[in-house]
Amino acid sequence: MALATERAGFKQIAVEDFRITEEPYYLPISDEVQLFETAYRENVPVLLKGPTGAGKTRFVEYMSWRLHNRDGIGHAEGVPLITVACHEDLTASDLVGRYLLEGDETRWIDGPISRAVKNGAICYLDEIVEARKDTTVLIHPLTDYRRLLPLEKRGELLEAADGFLLVMSYNPGYQSALKDLKHSTRQRFIAIEFDYPPREQEAQIIAKESGVDPAIANELAKLAEKVRNLKEHGLGEGVSTRLLVYAGKLIHDGITPRRACQVSIVWALTDDQEVQRSIEEVVSSIFE
């Protein structure tokens, strides 16, 4: 029986036990599925490159589900998936593990990458360029034939279990001299590039994910194409497929298309009033 303070649907599990057991919706655009499956079989680390909201994380979830063993009645048990949202304060200890005080004793607590190595999981480092450069160096022994993770504080080496794969992602549009991958890191991965889908496929994704009418989904995909062309006129980044799905969900639940686009796209993309007006003009030309 759930505790009184817990809400329905709440779950708490160890990160190494997390599996995608239901198929996530993912529409392949090119040969990315075949490339990832081959990399997984050959223990080749994978780097995913692409703009925000282009489907990188959903792709990893889909591949985690797809790389599974099915039992006799068709139920799927996906490969364990451990995700780390990288940030500028992420340290090597955050990834590998650290000693913690418990009373008069110290106890070693594994970090997410150590747990992934031990359990044969996919370890997904999301937005890796946000992490400190000295942090990313620790993964180097995991990304070649050695497949080893040094635990310097314990004087140990962890040899990756079968099934372990290191996957990283980043947005090339956010690169700068201070936030870029070291060449010694980049050349340890194969790179799969993501971009926003062509209009027909994007409309299909919007309709499936939001439940909105296909005709509206097509108009949203058309809107996306036009808004992305504004990148050369002050817009920092094009509208993501994710935001289009949000707009579709609002429309599906009764919000007018123009209002849904205003809160999901116009205001979400920029605070620059001139750019906002430009986007609103595009919205008005499509949703009269």
Where are these regions (language model features)?
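Conserved AAA+ ATPase small/helical "lid" subdomain
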Residues: 210-265
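C-terminal engagement/docking regions of AAA+ P-loop ATPases
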Residues: 257-288
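AAA+ P-loop NTPase catalytic core and its hallmark functional loops
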Residues: 1-218, 222, 284-288
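A short, ordered amphipathic alpha-helix with a cationic face
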Residues: 192-195, 234, 253, 270
